[in-house]
Amino acid sequence: MEAQIDRLFREHPCFSRAAAHWFGRLHLPVAPDCNIKCHYCTRLYDCANENRPGVTSRLLTPGEALQHVRRVLAVEPRIKVIGIAGPGDPLANRATLTTLRLVHEQFPDLIKCISTNGLLLSENLPALQEAGVKAVTVTVNAVSPVVGARIYGYVFYRNRVYRGRAGAELLWRAQYAGIRRAAEMGLAVKVNSVLIPGVNDEHLYQVAVAVRAAGAHLMNVIPLIPRGAFSSLLPPPPGQVARIRQKLTPIIDQMVHCRRCRADAAGMLEEGGA
């Protein structure tokens, strides 16, 4: 188990800044649907001009995704990681597991990973591990229902819609269970937290403590890109982001080289491969 984690930190460019100089990643945009509404999120499926999560130039079917992997590897052999990060939530889409299985059958040595809100993570971990997934990223913006209610418009779970504190509490419970189980199963776990000034900036310390206790290995504080219901907010200045990362480092290691990748990102982080 420790050897698997060590390999992830040597070769996964999102888990290691050193690895980002040597290895690349390829995101497969096969997951359009989502099961929560984040107030900072707008998803675009035919966008070639924005470099941020939730956008892609086009959606792919699982078969198209496999062909895309073959084409990209033919011209960029430094790709070590195949990830699914949207443009919706991977675990809200059946195509995610189908795609991962297809890719794993053809390219078993590549690292497979997903980025998810965590609502359905725990129950899907056995299938994900069977499909070759070795790393997961879970976006955790709040561990307090009071704070979470300001960030999430709704949570859709098992054919019911949960709003306000009830939705935020349900989401965090699922995230905690998923992070803990993933870590126990030997997966590398990174947590993304969007820094939203005036909403959760004073709360991220509690988030860091909670996700580290759950078993997460790494945390990535992502500055808000004002969109959606939060379009009127200002993004946090770089100095604030740096101070918060410094404050949280003694609790959990911090990722500091994030490029806020698109759902169809390809190439090397350190060479601007968006």
Language model features with spans:
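Short, small-residue-enriched loops and turns at beta-alpha junctions
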Residues: 58, 88-92, 196-199, 227-230
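Flexible glycine/acidic-rich beta-alpha junction loops that bind and position SAM and/or redox cofactors
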Residues: 146-152, 198-201, 218-239, 261-273
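Short glycine-enriched, charge-decorated loop/helix-capping segments at active-site entrances
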Residues: 52-57, 152-155, 164-165, 233-236
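Conserved AdoMet/S-adenosylmethionine-binding subsite of the radical SAM
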Residues: 91-222
